[in-house]
Amino acid sequence: MSETYLSSFHSAAQHGPRPLPLFLSLLRSETATSPERRAAALAGLKAYQEAERPAGRVARPAIATAGRASLRDYGGSGVPVVFVPSLINPPFILDLAPGNSLLEWLATQGVRPLLVDWGTPGPEDRDQGIDHHIAALLLPLLDALDEPPILAGYCLGGTLAMAAASLRPVRGLVTIAAPWRFRRYGDFARAAIAAQWEAARPACDQLGLVPMEVLQSGFWQLDPARTIAKFERFAKLAPGSDPARAFLALEDWANAGAPLTYSAGAEMFERFFRGDRPGGGRWWVKGTRILPSRLACPALELLSTTDRIVPAATAAGLAERRSLALGHVGMIVGGRAREMVWQPLRDWLLAAAHTK
């Protein structure tokens, strides 16, 4: 039986947003002074929940496994480029839909894209922290390859890829919208994130997992106005139109996703957001201090000046960087992503592949 990325969520009677009670609370507060906006947002929500979905994207074959993680092959030829997605959302943002898949496109451009699929943890995995994900899942997948790859990490996956590039010989490293200097989220945002974690931590401890609803709540709080406004806009789209299908694909991705292990979630909130260990030069993995300045390979960071999820100020500050104004997700699947991200990324990957 072939795997699909969206099987359980896709078959739900309603499609979110998750957590729905919080979404409705935000909707009420954001539209408190405008009955017209509230009606439009509710109409958009209803249309989203009732819209027909295409069949879920089929997962590509795995060429290597390590525990619950796997390395999925997108074909192509040339140097292997291992894409490391975030632990927080599903990996298929990099393979969102036919015609809007960075990985499928790169496979036609002279590189061999491979995607890390972190799998679905269970309560028995509660003690697997972020360092475990690197040492016991990511590094063995890299070791299974016949040659050193280029690493490309998106969002928190870029943070993890930085560590992997410090622990294994690689041809190059690209980080895309990846946080590193967490203190630069600012005191207000970090305090709100800390309060959210303190409220959720006891239940997560009991579960042994951090459900995606906990993480989604944090994302929404970063930009509640946009969270509601996009459903107002969706209400105006013709059902089945290209913009409507694109919205459904992206929102279904944002509302899907496996939980984090308890330890990975706790470390993200406590060691990264609160303690800023990466940005403070105090993050050690397998006895190695992870410092961007010590990378022994070509490295590029792509960041967005309009990113609310990972503000540009939180980037590592690599010597080679490109600043764009496409938004956190728009860098990967937006209307200008191919021209402004995909094509320059391809050019950089091909150049790095020939660097001795």
What role is predicted for each listed range?
Residues 305-322:
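Conserved loop-alpha-helix segment in the C-terminal half of the alpha/beta-hydrolase fold
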Residues 1-54, 356:
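N-terminal targeting or regulatory segments adjacent to alpha/beta-hydrolase or S9 domains
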Residues 309-312, 326-340:
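Catalytic histidine-centered segment of alpha/beta-hydrolase-like enzymes
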Residues 51-122:
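Short, surface-exposed "cap/lid" segments of acyl-processing enzymes
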Residues 152-161:
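Gly/Ala-rich beta-loop-alpha elbow adjacent to hydrolase catalytic centers
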